[in-house]
């Protein structure tokens, strides 16, 4: 059995936008995989053993070898399953540009950034979180422009990096009392376009389900 055909397992938590990246990438490549859902409050021995440094999902296990960090996993998937189209452009300059924007999205549109909105009651800290979130989205929207995807007509690396957070927009809007579409209509249109892809539709949870999870987190962290 070739390496690209051996068993693939994702240690997952359904609401994790980072784990969603990995699952979207695998589905884009047509790779069959198993999902092991993790209880993040009672992590499995397999998760702790597979990712001893960060102890976080997602972990991609391929041929019994664990790989941590979602963007590293997406690159690994791209380099391992080469029969399907690459997530990155062929020329070095365009690849570098895509990596720059994926890195920007990863650093600015994040779980921690979202927590500044849902993890605070209405007030100065939440307003600061909203401002930072929307400013970053507007930078990404300017880069997207009128293109179908960040890579033009091709769904790729930057799209895979950012699209999981589309499923969190509704929860952030509800907690922060704002509209992403009013501020960044092209980003929302892009998100809707991405969800038309089977890989994304099969991966992203319903926005209401994410919102209910966020309400639980607010209770756990004493926000409510």
Curated annotation (Swiss-Prot):
This is Glutathione S-transferase U28. One of its GO terms (molecular function) is glutathione transferase activity. Glutathione binds at residues 16-17, 42-43, 56-57, 69-70. It holds the Pfam family GST_C. The keyword Cytoplasm applies. It comes from Arabidopsis thaliana. Belongs to the GST superfamily. Tau family. Gene3D superfamilies: 1.20.1050.10, Glutaredoxin. One of its GO terms (cellular component) is cytoplasm. May be involved in the conjugation of reduced glutathione to a wide number of exogenous and endogenous hydrophobic electrophiles and have a detoxification role against certain herbicides. The gene is GSTU28. It is found in: Cytoplasm, Cytosol.
């Amino acid at each position: 059995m070739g390496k690209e055909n051996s068993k693939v397992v994702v240690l997952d938590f359904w609401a994790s936008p980072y784990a969603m990246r990995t699952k979207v990438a695998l589905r884009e490549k047509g790779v069959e995989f198993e999902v092991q859902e993790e209880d993040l409050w009672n992590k499995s021995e397999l998760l702790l053993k597979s990712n001893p440094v960060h102890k976080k999902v997602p972990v991609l296990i391929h041929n019994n070898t664990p790989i941590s960090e979602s963007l590293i996993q997406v690159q690994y998937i791209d380099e391992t399953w080469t029969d399907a189209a690459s997530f990155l452009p062929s020329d070095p300059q365009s690849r570098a540009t895509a990596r720059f924007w994926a890195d920007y999205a990863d650093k600015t549109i994040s779980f921690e950034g979202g927590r500044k909105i849902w993890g605070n009651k209405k007030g100065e800290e939440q307003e600061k979180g909203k401002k930072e979130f929307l400013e970053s989205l507007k930078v990404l929207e300017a880069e997207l422009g009128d293109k179908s995807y960040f890579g033009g007509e091709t769904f790729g690396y930057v799209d895979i990096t950012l699209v999981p957070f589309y499923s969190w927009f509704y929860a952030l809007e509800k907690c922060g009392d704002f509209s992403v579409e009013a501020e960044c209509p092209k980003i929302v249109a892009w998100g809707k376009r991405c969800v038309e892809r089977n890989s994304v539709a099969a991966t992203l949870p319903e926005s209401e389900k994410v919102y209910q999870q966020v309400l639980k987190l607010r209770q756990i962290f004493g926000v409510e």
